[in-house]
């Protein structure tokens, strides 16, 4: 009975093994072989007496060689649809070349030989045209603005004014340059955010009032008499009891002139002389027109304030610094003048200070020469020297500065006329 069962089981087992694939059978054989090798190695080590470590190492080498030979065998059957064979380097290189060729071919569009190629029409970007148009408009506006600035300067003929001042005002080159810089910047356009307030300060006889008269004459010639006001305190408001009347007159003249100038798009010029004797109430009226919280037409005006205030400070500064040939009037001088002006009234806080310094003797000679030519007299050099020697001078560092400036030149020349 038992023999029959074993006989029946043996064919069944044999049939199951036959169903397994060839790799399974190879693994079974390799496992059996490993077991027999282990047993034989152990028996050999026991008989020969070699150490177990060397036996184990040799056994590992044998197993690795058996595994390598197992994978190298051709017992694996090549499947029809899929396998796990690792590709060689040659196959990989060949496949990459084929793929590259396919990609290169796919990029080109093939057209039939008898068909005309119709390439897509390239559409031009409109943004580029808009950008060019915008740049052209901006350039035109800039060019137009520059032309308008030139037109304004030509309208007031500031170049001619500068030449006149340089020709007829002696010894005040720095003051004239500063004055013209302010006028050119302000009169270049008609719209401003504040009025231009200039203050001529210096000792007597240095050319402040003479410069004011030249400015009034020039602007009357280029604009009209209706847009230029010359106001002398000693002449227009000599009596302190008439201050209220003077206030009304000054306020009315300024308002009326500004209104007319705004209609014709012109900038009026107001010249106030002898401010050192002007009443405080009248200074308050002027200060009201210098404020920023006014209508726009009152912001387009030029105010020139002429006074001897700060003249002593300028005289001391020039005499103390006579050895220095400074190109520009230092800020220290303007600070000294402004300190003296603030003691008089606070309206000078918004003014641009233009200091007029002392005149040297050579400038006095120029004044005599110019006056002689005006009167039609022969300009004898020795006669001019004698006339200039009659004036008083400050002497400092081999330089002579006139105490009274050119103020007595006209009177001295008039004394010559009966004898010529």
UniProtKB/Swiss-Prot annotation:
Gene for this chain: tor4a
Keyword Transmembrane: yes
Keyword Ion transport: no
Positions with a binding annotation for ATP: 202-209
Membrane topology: Single-pass membrane protein
Organism domain of life: Eukaryota
Bilayer-crossing regions: 130-150
Name this polypeptide is given: Torsin-4A
Similarity-based family: Belongs to the ClpA/ClpB family. Torsin subfamily.
Organism per entry: Xenopus tropicalis
């Amino acid at each position: 009975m038992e023999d029959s069962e074993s006989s029946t089981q043996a064919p069944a087992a044999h049939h199951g093994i036959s169903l397994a694939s060839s790799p399974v059978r190879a693994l079974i054989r390799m496992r059996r072989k490993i077991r027999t090798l282990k047993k034989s190695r152990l028996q050999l080590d026991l008989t020969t007496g070699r150490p177990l470590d060397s036996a184990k190492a040799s056994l590992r080498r044998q197993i690795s060689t058996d595994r390598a030979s197992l994978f190298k065998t051709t017992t694996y059957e090549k499947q029809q649809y899929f396998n796990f064979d690792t590709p060689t380097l040659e196959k990989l290189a060949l496949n990459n070349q084929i793929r590259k060729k396919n990609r290169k071919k796919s990029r080109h569009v093939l057209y039939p030989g008898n068909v005309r190629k119709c390439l897509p029409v390239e559409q031009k970007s409109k943004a580029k045209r808009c950008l060019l148009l915008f740049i052209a408009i901006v350039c035109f506006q800039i060019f137009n603005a520059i032309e308008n600035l030139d037109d304004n300067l030509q309208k007031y003929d500031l170049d001619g004014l500068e030449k006149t001042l340089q020709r007829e005002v002696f010894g005040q080159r720095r003051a004239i340059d500063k004055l013209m810089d302010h006028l050119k910047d302000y009169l270049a356009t008609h719209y401003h955010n504040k009025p231009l307030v200039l203050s001529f300060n210096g000792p007597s006889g240095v050319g402040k009032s003479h410069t004011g008269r030249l400015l009034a004459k020039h602007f009357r010639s280029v604009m009209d008499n209706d847009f230029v006001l010359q106001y002398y305190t000693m002449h227009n408001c000599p009596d302190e009891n008439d201050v209220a009347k003077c206030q009304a007159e000054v306020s009315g003249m300024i308002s009326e002139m500004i209104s007319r100038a705004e209609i014709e798009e012109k900038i009026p010029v107001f010249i106030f002389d002898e401010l050192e004797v002007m009443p405080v109430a009248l200074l308050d009226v002027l200060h009201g027109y210098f404020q920023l919280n006014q209508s726009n037409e009152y912001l387009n005006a030029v105010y020139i304030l002429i006074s001897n205030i700060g003249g002593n400070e300028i005289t001391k500064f020039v005499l103390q610094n006579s050895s220095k040939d400074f190109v520009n009037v230092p800020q220290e001088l303007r600070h000294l003048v402004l300190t003296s002006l603030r003691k008089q009234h606070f309206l000078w806080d918004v003014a641009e200070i233009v200091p007029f310094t002392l005149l040297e003797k050579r400038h006095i000679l120029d004044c005599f020469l110019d006056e002689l030519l005006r009167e039609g007299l022969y300009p004898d050099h020795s006669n001019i020297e004698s006339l200039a020697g009659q004036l008083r001078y400050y002497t400092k560092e081999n330089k002579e500065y006139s105490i009274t400036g050119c103020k007595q030149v006209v009177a001295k020349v008039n004394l010559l006329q009966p004898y010529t």
